């Protein structure tokens, strides 16, 4: 990419999907690490303050007109088109099947984007692998949105080789457009400094950390069953969970989580901390004995990358993408085997010290800088004219 190539990124995520906003923040840091710090961030006008700390130029987009006819006529696209005229870029990323919620765009996109080069992003194909977690309407929304995206996207970015293989299998006609961008966490300097916040004032000295939103596929219940097994052996570790207690796909799930704590007799061992500020979440991971990542499915796991840059060991579900991420110090268990997870947790609880491990952090921090620059260079190659 030449110095004159202007890059535009579209805001993702928010309180309902923290992984999306971290994805964009880390990509901005990766570009800076690769020597290309200039970018324009497109976000809704009411989200500008959420992104101001990134320091990049922000292109605000007027909010949606909420009316079905407006969508059918593509009138909301005019708001994004106006922002793009005011802040022109040469390459725009990521366009997704959730564009309407992220930035107010509906398909088709040709008239809106005109000559701007762009790439689509499909985080994963979870609805194909775990259809039991989706209603027919939810699965159809994803399938239809992905089909519309693929019909127009000149490039489709996937976050892992595993996800790219899925796209080639499910949509073989589009295999030639696939690029893989494995993202990385950018460690901030303050993460390695003494923590001064009050959010962790009442936590125990030793604990396992589980840092996932409370969605069904994140598989918290297997962790709770493992704790029940350990309790029968007289081993009672603490587990601290972060993440919003809210699953839009299954609103009853948070109640099931709380009920499981009572039914398994582990309510006094598990703290549900809710959605913590990012710095407090990072400190929680630093201090943990290990992070437990029990997810049944991921496109690429942000929390695995977080643990990597903090030098913390992980107990991970044995799913293809976790094997692909291959974090140092990872120990794997079959995703729904509470028994094997219990064995791993018992060994870690009895033999591993709590963090932080300053030597491991220093090594991980150095490796993270190299890894981040590689991500930035990979993105610059994807965005280059072809």
PLM feature spans:
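Carbohydrate transferase catalytic cores enriched for Leloir-type hexosyltransferases
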Residues: 1-386
């Amino acid at each position: 990419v030449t110095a004159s190539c202007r890059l535009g990124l579209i805001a993702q995520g928010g309180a309902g999907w923290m992984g999306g906003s971290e994805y964009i923040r880390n990509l901005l840091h990766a570009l800076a690490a690769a020597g290309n710090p200039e970018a324009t961030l497109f976000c809704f006008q009411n989200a500008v303050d959420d992104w101001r700390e990134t320091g990049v130029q922000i292109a605000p987009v007027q909010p949606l007109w909420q009316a079905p006819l407006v969508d059918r006529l593509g009138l909301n696209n005019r708001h994004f088109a106006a922002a793009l005229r005011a802040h022109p870029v040469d390459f725009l990323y990521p366009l997704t099947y959730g564009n309407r919620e992220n930035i107010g765009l509906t398909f088709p996109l040709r008239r809106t984007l005109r000559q701007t080069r762009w790439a689509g992003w499909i985080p994963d194909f979870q609805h194909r692998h775990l259809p039991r977690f989706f209603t027919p309407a939810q699965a159809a929304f994803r399938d239809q949105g992905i089909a519309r995206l693929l019909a127009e996207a000149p490039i489709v970015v996937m976050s892992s080789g595993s996800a790219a293989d899925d796209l080639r299998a499910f949509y073989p006609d589009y295999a030639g457009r696939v690029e893989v961008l494995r993202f990385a966490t950018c460690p901030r300097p303050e993460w390695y400094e003494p923590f001064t916040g009050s959010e962790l004032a009442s936590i125990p000295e030793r604990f396992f950390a589980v840092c996932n939103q409370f969605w069904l596929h994140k598989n918290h219940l297997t962790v709770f069953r493992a704790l029940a097994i350990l309790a029968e052996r007289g081993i009672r570790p603490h587990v601290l969970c972060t993440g919003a207690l809210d699953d839009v796909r299954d609103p009853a799930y948070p109640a099931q989580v709380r009920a499981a704590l009572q039914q398994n007799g582990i309510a006094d061992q598990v703290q549900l901390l809710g959605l913590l500020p990012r710095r407090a979440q990072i400190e929680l991971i630093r201090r943990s004995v290990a992070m437990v990542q029990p997810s049944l499915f991921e496109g690429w796991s942000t929390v695995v990358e977080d643990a990597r840059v903090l030098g913390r060991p992980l107990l991970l579900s044995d799913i293809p993408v976790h094997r692909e991420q291959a974090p140092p110090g990872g120990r794997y268990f079959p995703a729904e085997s509470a028994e094997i997870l219990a064995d791993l947790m018992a060994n870690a609880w009895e033999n591993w010290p709590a963090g932080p491990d300053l030597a491991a952090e220093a090594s991980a921090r150095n490796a993270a800088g190299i890894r981040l620059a590689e991500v930035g260079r990979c993105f610059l190659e994807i965005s280059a004219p072809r």
